[in-house]
Design a protein with these regions (language model features):
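Alpha-helical transmembrane segments and their cytosolic interface
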Residues: 1-4, 10-11, 16-17, 154-213
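Helix-boundary and loop/linker segments of multi-pass membrane transporters
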Residues: 10-12, 37, 108, 148-155
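Alpha-helical transmembrane segments of multipass membrane proteins
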Residues: 26-29, 93, 97, 122-130, ...
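Short helix-perturbing small/polar motifs within transmembrane alpha-helices
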Residues: 89-131
Length: 216
């Protein structure tokens, strides 16, 4: 991911501020958690939006940095779970969502619809990956009595709980992704080279509002 982003930065220096904005957005919106059954939580990520704007490898790097900051500064997600969280939200989500976006954009010629379903399907795919990782733990990790050491819930519980919860939270992710995509379209921006501070002012104000509203 770092190598791919370095090539992109060498080609276009304006990728750096966009990458910073994307990382900030991802960090902030992930702070708004909704409780889900079984001690888990659901939240938007922004990974597909970053993938659409800068590419999936850039999204992988940005979301990984955001997750690391959350784990180290706030204990959110946990350091020991960083690898699993990064795999689900910084690898599965941006690459699946970006693939859906590209496919639908080719079929429909409508980037707003494509970005909505890219964000929606991307976060559902990430949630189902989490469900599988949690659901196989009772099989893999047991004590001498056969009791689960960590997560006690099997796949028949984790899959529907995480899946159904994120079918709802996925709407937030989809609308967020499509909304920012529409914002960029209305500015008649075809690529990141045309992004200026003046044009991005509403987005920067949105980030400031998220900072103020972020629960600490």
């Amino acid at each position: 991911a770092v190598k791919e982003v370095k090539v992109k930065v060498d080609t276009d220096k304006k990728t750096i501020p966009m990458l910073g904005i994307g990382t900030s957005l991802s960090f902030l919106i992930m702070m708004f958690n909704l409780p889900a059954p079984g001690g888990t939580s659901a939240h938007a990520v922004g990974a597909v939006l970053i993938a659409i704007l800068l590419g999936p490898w850039a999204s992988c790097l940005a979301v990984s940095v955001a997750l690391a900051m959350q784990a180290l500064l706030f204990g959110d997600g946990g350091i020991l779970a960083f690898g699993a969280n990064a795999f689900c939200m910084a690898v599965v989500m941006p690459f699946v969502g970006y693939a859906v976006y590209k496919l639908l954009n080719k079929w429909t010629k409508n980037r707003i619809i494509a970005s909505f379903f890219g964000g929606y399907i991307g976060i559902v795919a990430a949630a189902l990956t989490v469900a599988v990782l949690l659901g196989i733990q009772p099989i893999l990790f047991k004590d001498s009595s056969g009791n689960p050491l960590y997560n006690p819930y099997p796949l028949r519980v984790t899959l529907p709980v995480m899946g159904l919860t994120h079918l709802l939270i996925g709407l937030v992710e989809g609308f967020f992704t499509a909304g920012v995509q529409e914002f960029i379209e209305r500015l008649n921006i075809d690529n990141t080279q045309e992004l200026t501070t003046k044009k991005l002012r509403p987005l920067l104000l949105f980030i400031l509002a998220l900072i103020i509203l972020t629960p600490l």
